[in-house]
Regions:
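Catalytic core of carbohydrate-active enzymes
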Residues: 1-173
Length: 177
């Protein structure tokens, strides 16, 4: 919930929709120009709904490394994929250089997003800096988390309300400890 709510807050301030066409995020990729069967949910999550009874879905992943949100399967972008999904699954991928805030309450959408938040760190590339914001119920910043990777050293910092916060490294490799 924290990620979706923050994307809604961003949408309120910028006018850029939370659920957007692929070309809005990848304007320099000609393959995204006419994609109408998949979309970006915010700036980090790609969703390719299943529209066929048999569960076959064809989708395109733009350049980069993409990690399936639920299974953790890693795929390289810049190519098309054709797969079969059942009623309980669909292609939902998180792009590299993403910090994804996952809430700790599955019962309600009305809770303190920063309390016990899980920050999933997705493949931060060497030389990159990325961040995420966790909002409070009024849309103000409750927590900011930043990741910087230099010389294969990944540094994670947080500022704000970070009670019981935890980091989960997803598809993060070649990091010195």
């Amino acid at each position: 919930m924290p990620y979706i709510y923050q994307m809604a807050v961003n949408s309120h301030h910028t006018g850029i929709p939370t659920m957007r066409s692929m070309v809005m995020e990848f304007e320099n990729d000609p393959a995204t120009k006419y994609l109408d069967m998949q979309y970006m949910l915010g700036d980090s999550i790609l969703v390719a709904p299943v529209f066929s009874k048999d569960g076959d879905v064809e989708y395109y992943l733009p350049e980069g490394t993409w990690t399936h949100l639920l299974s953790g399967e890693v795929k390289q972008g810049g190519r098309w994929y054709k797969e079969n999904y059942d009623f309980m699954s669909l292609p939902v991928y998180v792009r590299d250089n993403t910090l994804l805030a996952i809430g700790n309450n599955e019962e309600t959408a009305d809770y303190d997003f920063a309390d016990g938040v899980e920050i999933r760190v997705y493949e931060v590339n060497n030389g990159c800096k990325t961040s995420c914001t966790v909002p409070d119920q009024k849309g103000h910043t409750a927590l900011t988390v930043e990741a910087v990777r230099e010389n294969n050293k990944l540094t994670l910092t947080s500022n704000g309300k970070n009670q019981n916060m935890r980091y989960v490294l997803e598809n993060v490799s070649n990091v010195a400890t």
